[in-house]
């Protein structure tokens, strides 16, 4: 082994690897030694979670969260146990098997693996709430039969669709020009402050900010917490749709409606003192492993923007002076009506998930369904704690 890092390589003899992608390797720059360990992969065919800098995997065992061993079971999508990972508070260090308390966590994430789904209502119609057929894809393979192209006016053009047969690789798994094996989503609504965003249970969510303020604060997470090899960003409308569809599949709650976070003080996870542990009906999986606060709590702005009448970025009162990079938001066609549902896109959990097309009361499970229009150009999702039955993961307004 050379002491010159530019000349150092890896030589492996007499070892049979089924696939190097199933191994996590690290090297010691002082000694030049390389160690590799086989990483755990469940039987669902979901892509293995990618841990970014300062993220540690956790699993729930004996009524507590512990640091997971990457070589042992720590998630199981067939059992509706989605992968969880956290960024710990500064100065907190843990070893495999150590307990992690909610107070020790700064950021909490859930892994959404790449998938395609069978299109069930792709032609601007009405459809009853139903199970969505999701199939995990390997690596960055794009195996869906349907392709869609975004147009300059914010609309999209898709190839021929046959409901119940055509499949579509969910578009949330393409970020700019990069195909993704999956992405991490915050487990709870954001909290803390714009100078130090947190994502954790048992605290009041951060509210009363402009879209641009949220956007900048969430981007700054990567430097605040040292996740420098990730591209932290505010959730896009299409990413919300990807989580919603996974919830509606056999890997989540399925056709069971997600419960509403009715806490009037806007506590994440539905309350204080680890209330999220009993409020599992508010999770996308119906257990502690899913994503919370997607129904009720506070309205959640997402990066879904309606163009202005000249087909340009329309900030309205969001606080942007220039448009963000196009990869950070989904663009929609201008219209003066909030019931012009045909402006929705495949995968975003808008026009496909309507029991009554063209009606604001027509969302699945009676969720509110109102598009951005001439008065306001941004999507908000999930409803808020005081809306009652119109709240839900398919709520948009």
Feature names for model-found ranges:
Residues 12-27, 218, 300-303:
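Extracellular/surface-associated beta-sandwich interaction domains
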Residues 122-176, 185, 339-396:
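Long, low-complexity, polar/charged, intrinsically disordered or flexibly structured peripheral segments
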Residues 115-118, 188-192, 304-307:
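Acidic glycine-/aspartate-rich tracts in secreted/extracellular proteins
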């Amino acid at each position: 082994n050379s002491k010159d890092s530019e000349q150092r390589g890896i030589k492996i003899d007499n070892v049979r690897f089924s696939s190097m992608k199933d191994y996590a390797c690290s090297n010691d720059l002082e000694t030049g030694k390389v160690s590799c360990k086989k990483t755990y992969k469940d039987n669902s065919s979901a892509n293995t979670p990618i841990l970014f800098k300062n993220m540690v995997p956790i699993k729930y065992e004996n009524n507590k969260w512990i640091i997971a061993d990457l070589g042992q079971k720590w998630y199981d999508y067939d059992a509706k146990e989605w992968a969880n990972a956290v960024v710990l508070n500064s100065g907190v260090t843990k070893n495999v098997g150590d307990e992690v308390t909610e107070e020790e966590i700064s950021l909490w994430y859930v892994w959404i693996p790449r998938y395609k789904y069978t299109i069930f209502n792709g032609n601007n119609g009405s459809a009853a709430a139903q199970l969505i057929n999701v199939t995990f894809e390997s690596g960055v393979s794009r195996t869906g039969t349907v392709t869609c192209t975004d147009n300059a006016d914010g609309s999209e053009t898709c190839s021929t669709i046959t409901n119940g047969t055509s499949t579509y690789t969910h578009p949330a798994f393409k970020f700019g020009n990069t195909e993704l094996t999956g992405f991490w989503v915050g487990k709870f609504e954001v909290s803390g402050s714009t100078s130090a965003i947190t994502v954790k249970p048992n605290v009041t969510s951060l509210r009363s900010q402009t879209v641009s303020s949220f956007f900048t604060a969430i981007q700054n997470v990567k430097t605040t917490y040292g996740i420098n090899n990730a591209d932290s960003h505010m959730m896009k409308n299409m990413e919300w749709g990807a989580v919603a569809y996974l919830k509606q599949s056999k890997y989540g709650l399925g056709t069971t409606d997600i419960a509403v976070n009715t806490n009037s003080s806007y506590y994440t996870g539905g309350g204080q003192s680890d209330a999220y542990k009993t409020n599992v009906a508010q999770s996308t999986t119906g257990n502690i492993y899913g994503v919370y606060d997607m129904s009720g709590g506070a309205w959640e702005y997402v990066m879904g923007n309606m163009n202005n009448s000249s087909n340009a970025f329309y900030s309205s009162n969001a606080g942007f002076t220039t448009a963000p990079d196009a990869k950070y938001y989904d663009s929609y066609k201008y219209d003066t009506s909030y019931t012009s549902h045909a402006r929705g896109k495949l995968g975003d959990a808008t026009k496909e998930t309507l029991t009554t097309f063209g009606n604001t009361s027509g969302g699945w499970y009676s969720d509110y369904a109102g598009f951005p229009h001439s008065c306001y150009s941004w999507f908000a999702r999930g409803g808020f704690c005081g809306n009652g039955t119109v709240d839900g993961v398919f709520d948009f307004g």
